[in-house]
């Protein structure tokens, strides 16, 4: 087999796989965000208790380099959206409580963050309930508790495009 034939074969696989991947991603839009119990500001609560707010639900871990990369822009996004009844909510897949706490301090995390106490072997039961197997992964949840967007991988959360997206979303009832 020549290199050209191999490249063509790989290209065809990618070309046919990508549309189904995108369709799968789109299919989550409009579904109700899975509820889970967490502790915020020392008080037990549920994700569903945050209805009425736009929630940027970010799954991350301290051992994840892309999560470290995007943490500063998530902090800036939190400052940008918080005055408009929205928040970034982090859920960490850290089994190690010390590593989790150190990450929060080292990165100056300013958004509410919860360590999934069931996290083991680099996995979070809460993240897995969403179908998340790669982190960072983020779900944007509207004021009605519906998922409106799923974003895989690190982002520049305070970029002009992201700000425009959140401006539009926050302008909706």
Question: What are these model-derived regions, one by one?
Answer:
Residues 1-37, 173:
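N-terminal targeting signals for export/organelle localization
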Residues 35-55, 78-81:
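A short beta-strand-turn-helix
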Residues 36, 45, 59-60, 103, ...:
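Conserved hydrophobic/aromatic "anchor" residues
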Residues 53-55, 60-63, 134:
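Short pre-active-site segment immediately N-terminal to redox-active cysteine/selenocysteine motifs
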Residues 68-108, 118-128, 164:
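Structural microenvironment flanking redox-active thiols in thiol-disulfide oxidoreductases
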Residues 102-109, 116-168:
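Thiol/disulfide oxidoreductase modules built on the thioredoxin-like
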